[in-house]
């Protein structure tokens, strides 16, 4: 039913509206309704030997072409194969049948890249032995380039160097420290499709001898799906099922975002799906599962997790422009309910020596909180408290955050510390 808004002075009817300044989300299933292939554009006019030299010298000089990188990766990886032990399909695309031997690029549709190939500097000293570590290095730079935090960036680069040295003991980094020529590679759709294809392939063939190539590609999986990760983290830290966690959603904004994420038919729970790579495969330009598109859910879930002593939640990003008051209260109530009850039950017995709980709780006052985690009981109790956090709830939250130190600005940890440790 529509609501009519009138100006009191003259009964003029107005229709309040906000500007449509955000792009709508795009679901992976919708992509495959329009197209049955993921095109990958590669220039294949140069030999692998030439491309190997172009990439090697280009990295050392700081003037490498992403077209050379993509062409080299294709040439070096196209013969890697794996044998399926089960049928593999996703969104109606038949990738392979059980017993088939498939390659990385069977996940995409190869197309010729038109245009003139940039010049490159040859290097006759480079051999096919480089193909055992150079693809790992090129793919690893994708992961390094995605972070701008200097300490973490150095840690990732050191890890990449160690991975390459495990293959070639004489390996030395080709990109000098401080040079960031590879940061923009993530803007090239063909490069990101190669990254996604490599990770999806080795996720299926985890024991493949080249599976270490996932060092750099693993961040492509569930990219821009932070809110979905929040849901999974909340289920783990509460020890509750997805259904039970969902019943604890008490805010309309969170419910709307949950419904957005749980749209049927998106293969969220299918491990070998294209879905986790919706961004890098170009299936979606606006993920329905990101913290940007689900700020209320992300905040509520991470705050609840933090109050349940999650170390991971402390550095979660604090969204802007959300209804903090109600979301904070909802997160506090949920965390207090879980933290005040232990979901303990005898799991095994010897003979018939089983504990039978006494249903007679007796001795409880009307002001005492429920002993379980039933949201209906807790909401009834919260109503009796005039829908305001009790002193014990506030003390519980303070104990959860009082020891937090070194918190970064605009994080859930920083927000909770300032909110509860007063």
Swiss-Prot record:
GO terms for molecular function: RNA binding. InterPro entries: Rhabdo_ncapsid, Rhabdovirus_ncapsid_C, Rhabdovirus_ncapsid_N, Rhabdovirus_nucleoprotein-like. RNA binds at residues 143, 152, 206, 214, 286, 317, 408. It is found in: Virion; Host cytoplasm. SUPFAM superfamilies: Rhabdovirus nucleoprotein-like. Keywords: Capsid protein, Helical capsid protein, Host cytoplasm, Ribonucleoprotein, RNA-binding, Viral nucleoprotein, Virion. It comes from the Viruses. The keyword RNA-binding applies. The keyword RNA-binding applies. Its main location: virion. GO terms for cellular component: helical viral capsid; host cell cytoplasm; ribonucleoprotein complex; viral nucleocapsid. Residues 350-390 are annotated as: Interaction with the phosphoprotein. Belongs to the vesiculovirus nucleocapsid protein family. Homomultimerizes to form the nucleocapsid. Binds to viral genomic RNA; this interaction contributes to the virion assembly. N in the nucleocapsid interacts (via C-terminus) with the P protein (via C-terminus); this interaction allows to package the L polymerase in the virion and positions the polymerase on the template, since P acts as a bridge between N and L. N(0) interacts with the P protein; this interaction prevents the uncontrolled aggregation of N(0). Interacts with the matrix protein (inner layer); this interaction contributes to the virion assembly. Interacts with the L polymerase. Encapsidates the genome in a ratio of one N per nine ribonucleotides, protecting it from nucleases. The encapsidated genomic RNA is termed the NC and serves as template for transcription and replication. The nucleocapsid is bullet-shaped with the tip containing 8 turns of a conical spiral before reaching the helical cylindrical trunk. Nucleocapsid assembly is concomitant with replication, therefore viral replication depends on the intracellular concentration of free N, termed N(0). All replicative products are resistant to nucleases. This is Nucleoprotein. The gene is N.
């Amino acid at each position: 039913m529509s609501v009519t808004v009138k100006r009191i002075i003259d009964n003029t009817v107005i229709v309040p509206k906000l500007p449509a300044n955000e792009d709508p989300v795009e679901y992976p299933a919708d992509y495959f309704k329009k197209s049955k292939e993921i095109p990958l554009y590669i220039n294949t006019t140069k030999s692998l030997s030439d491309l190997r030299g172009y990439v090697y010298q280009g990295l050392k000089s700081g003037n490498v072409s992403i077209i050379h990188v993509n062409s080299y990766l294709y040439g070096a990886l196209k013969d890697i194969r794996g044998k399926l032990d089960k049928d593999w399909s996703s969104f109606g695309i038949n990738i392979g049948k059980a017993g088939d031997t498939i390659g990385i690029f069977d996940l995409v549709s190869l197309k010729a890249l038109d245009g003139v190939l940039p010049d490159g500097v040859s290097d006759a000293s480079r051999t096919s032995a480089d193909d055992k570590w150079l693809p790992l290095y090129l793919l690893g730079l994708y992961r390094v380039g995605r972070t701008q935090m200097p300490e973490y960036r150095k840690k990732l680069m050191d890890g990449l160097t160690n991975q390459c040295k495990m293959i070639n003991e004489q390996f030395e980094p080709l990109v000098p420290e401080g040079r960031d020529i590879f940061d923009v590679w993530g803007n090239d759709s063909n490069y990101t499709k190669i990254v996604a294809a490599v990770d999806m392939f080795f996720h299926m063939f985890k024991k493949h001898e080249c599976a270490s190539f996932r060092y750099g590609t693993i961040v492509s999986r569930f990219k821009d799906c932070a809110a979905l990760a929040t849901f999974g983290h909340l289920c783990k830290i509460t020890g509750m099922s997805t259904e039970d966690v969902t019943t604890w959603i008490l805010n309309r904004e969170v419910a709307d975002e949950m419904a957005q994420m749980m749209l049927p038919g998106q293969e969220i729970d299918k491990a070998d799906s294209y879905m986790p790579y919706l961004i890098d495969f170009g299936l979606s330009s606006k993920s329905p599962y990101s913290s940007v598109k689900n700020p209320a859910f992300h905040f509520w879930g991470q705050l609840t997790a933090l109050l349940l002593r999650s170390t991971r939640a402390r550095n979660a990003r604090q969204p802007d422009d959300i209804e903090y008051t109600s979301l904070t209260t909802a997160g506090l109530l949920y965390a207090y309910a879980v933290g005040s009850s232990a979901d303990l039950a005898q799991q095994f017995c010897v003979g018939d020596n089983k504990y039978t709980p006494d249903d007679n709780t007796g001795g409880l006052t009307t002001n005492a909180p429920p002993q379980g985690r039933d949201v209906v009981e807790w909401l009834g109790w919260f109503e009796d408290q005039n829908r305001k956090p009790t002193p014990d709830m506030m003390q519980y939250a303070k104990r959860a955050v009082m020891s937090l130190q070194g918190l970064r600005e605009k994080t859930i940890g920083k927000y909770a510390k300032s909110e509860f440790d007063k």
